[in-house]
Amino acid sequence: MPESLLPLDRLMTTLRTRAAERPEGSYTTKLMNGGAEAIGRKIREEAEELIEAADEPDEAGRQHAIYEAGDLIYHAMVLMAWRGIELDEVAAELARREGTSGLVEKASRPAKKDSGTADS
């Protein structure tokens, strides 16, 4: 694993521990106890904040986007740990898609039930 990705590996180790032990007073425990709905709410919130930050000008906007990307990745990893998904599994999925057009990959997926939204 590249050294730059080691913090993600360490974070995932911590999140797996939190998922197993659910220590009192932990923010991560609170999210995990709320399940997919609570974690998903935070992911949506952080995604919106990242989008807003990405539109901010100059280096300050770039730094804000980096900060918000960290929040989004953290919360996505909380969901992964809650669901028992490992970073290696996500990496393998991304490797599987490598070299495949996004449109081709999307077309190969099974059809989803209509969620009532356009362009899901």
Curated annotation (Swiss-Prot):
Xref: Gene3D superfamilies: MazG-like (1.10.287.1080)
Positions of transmembrane segments: none
The reaction(s) annotated as catalysed by this protein in its Swiss-Prot or TrEMBL entry are:
1-(5-phospho-beta-D-ribosyl)-ATP + H2O = 1-(5-phospho-beta-D-ribosyl)-5'-AMP + diphosphate + H(+)
* Gene Ontology CC, one term: cytoplasm
The subcellular localization recorded is:
Cytoplasm
This protein's pathway? Amino-acid biosynthesis; L-histidine biosynthesis; L-histidine from 5-phospho-alpha-D-ribose 1-diphosphate: step 2/9
Basic and acidic residues composition bias: which ranges? 106-120
The alphabetized UniProt keywords are: Amino-acid biosynthesis, ATP-binding, Cytoplasm, Histidine biosynthesis, Hydrolase, Nucleotide-binding
Q: Name one Pfam family in it.
A: PRA-PH
- Which Gene Ontology biological process is one annotated for this entry? L-histidine biosynthetic process
Q: Name one GO molecular function term.
A: phosphoribosyl-ATP diphosphatase activity
What residue spans carry the region label Disordered?
97-120
Q: What is its EC number?
A: 3.6.1.31
Q: Which family does it belong to?
A: Belongs to the PRA-PH family.
Q: In its UniProt entry, what is this protein called? A: Phosphoribosyl-ATP pyrophosphatase
Please name the taxonomic classification of the source.
Bacteria, Pseudomonadati, Planctomycetota, Planctomycetia, Pirellulales
Q: Write the gene name.
A: hisE
